[in-house]
Amino acid sequence: MSEYKSVQKGSLKLKGVSLPSKKKKKKNKEMKRLEEQVLTSENEEGTKKAYVDKRTPAQMAFDKIQEKRQMERILKKASKTHKRRVEDFNRHLDTLTEHYDIPKVSWTK
């Protein structure tokens, strides 16, 4: 047991490496200053002009038509139920030649 009495307890101390110093806590002055900066920047942003649209008239017309066509596609797809879509698909398969023959799709499964 006397062999273990001289054992050094604690963390290892490496040469050339200083002990890590505790970080200083930030004072409330800095936090208050930062909050004031944020508030003043928000006020400045509110006084700035609104977003200016830099698109050409042709680009605006193109986007408007794109939105209109997309809405038409959505309404067209939403108007049919799944059952109706399956029936239309089966009717389309019936019109094809036997080269493309695949079994009919069941809407119940």
From Swiss-Prot:
Comp. bias regions, Low complexity: 9-20
Compositionally biased intervals (Basic residues): 21-30
Coiled-coil region: none
Gene Ontology CC terms, in alphabetical order: nucleolus
Superkingdom of the organism of origin: Eukaryota
Residues covered by region (Disordered): 1-48
Places the protein is found: Nucleus
Keywords: Apoptosis, Cell cycle, Nucleus
Short name of any one Pfam family annotated for the protein: FAM32A
Keyword Transit peptide in annotation: no
A biological-process GO annotation: apoptotic process
Protein purpose: May induce G2 arrest and apoptosis. May also increase cell sensitivity to apoptotic stimuli.
Family membership noted in the UniProt record: Belongs to the FAM32 family.
Protein name: Protein FAM32A-like
Record organism: Danio rerio
